[in-house]
Amino acid sequence: MRSFMTVTVFGLLASSPAFANDDALVADAQAILQTFKTQGKINKFLTTASGYAVFPTIAKGGLIVGGAGGDGVLFVGGKPVGTANMGQASIGLQLGGQTYSEIIFFENPSTLSDFKNNHFQLDAQATAVAISAGASADANYTRGVAVVTMTKAGLMGEASVGGQKFTFHPFTGSAAKH
């Protein structure tokens, strides 16, 4: 009986509405978006992109073998439409750890659709434009995507966004009212 109660309690906790966490993630994404707006030239992308994914915090670390991951929010028409998970694994010369924020701009409906249908990843040649305090960065679209990043903390002896894979989760029900 005790194990049945434990399973029931964990089941209820696991099935609680996820949108409470989604609300916090959306708030974090909107705050980071404002920081990017004041630190660099992203406004041109905000007005022309079919959509954009904002990852407030991506943690990355490695010692020859490395990995990175984080959660973000997809915006279409300036409104949050779902969450996304990013994962990246790499092998090669790398040492250290860092956290950073990332925004991926989708130039056209085709690349946005690929992202929403989980057919999107940044290839090995993908590069990001780093935005730092007080400096402006000029990013451009490549293959329908522009990526900008901003380091939050840490130092990493390797900096690529290639190989990032994404999984999109649309908001449903009351969570869709963000």
Feature annotation, model-predicted:
Residues 16-20:
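Sec/Tat signal peptide C-region and signal peptidase I cleavage site
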Residues 1-4:
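Positively charged n-region of N-terminal signal peptides that target proteins for export
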Residues 21-178:
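Small-residue-enriched, tightly packed secondary-structure blocks
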Residues 6-15:
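Bacterial N-terminal signal peptides
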